Amino acid sequence: MMKHNHLAGKRFLSLLLASALAFACTLPAAAVDPLGSGVMPTYDEAYYAMLDYYGNLTEGSVVKSYTLNGANSISDYGKYDSVNNLTDSTLHSTTGSKTTFDFGSTPPEHFYFEGKTTQPFETLPWTISMSYKLNGVPSNAEDLAGKTGVVEIDLNFVPNESASSYARNNYTLEAMAVFNQDDILSLKAEGAQVQLVGNLRIVLFLCLPGEEQHFTIEVGTNDFSFGGMTLLMVPATLS
């Protein structure tokens, strides 16, 4: 019974947009204030989004990892609905789109914080949608848990014209689904790499920069359950 909840759970589809240094450098110089000593903290960031059964955003946040390089404060620029310190008990102050953490005389070497925001989702390199069928008949995702037959999961990735030209031309999209071999009768996923790891079948799809792709996963089962999709968007090159 517990496995049925996987389909109905909030984490049905998760999206991870990882911003490597090349991407972070498209917004950087204004993102960190140099201190009077000339010390400049540096950071990496990642955008995380939780989506519903069909690809609609339910929650999003930016997580930033700062290396302080001896600085005793950081000032970050970004519009966040809320800010969470993931490192220590240091409180933040916010003025407009500027968030400041002042660490006093004992700054950490590395500092992490989360800024809740949905804004980056609108400019991801792809728009994402999913739909479902049971034995060839369109079905609501919420109705599929525990069903018998062939379940089709249709994935649609369309380049987003609202994304920056850099993101559209440089980011790849990787989509992954995992199925327990003991719980399924058959698995078909054209255009995917399917790997067997222990009793798990891992389905991997890839979209190259600027590509529109439509993929289908077909699962034969007597008792359908699905842990969801994990999506990763990263630059095609890290140089």
Residue ranges and their predicted role:
Residues 2-239:
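Cytosol-facing boundaries of transmembrane alpha helices in integral membrane proteins
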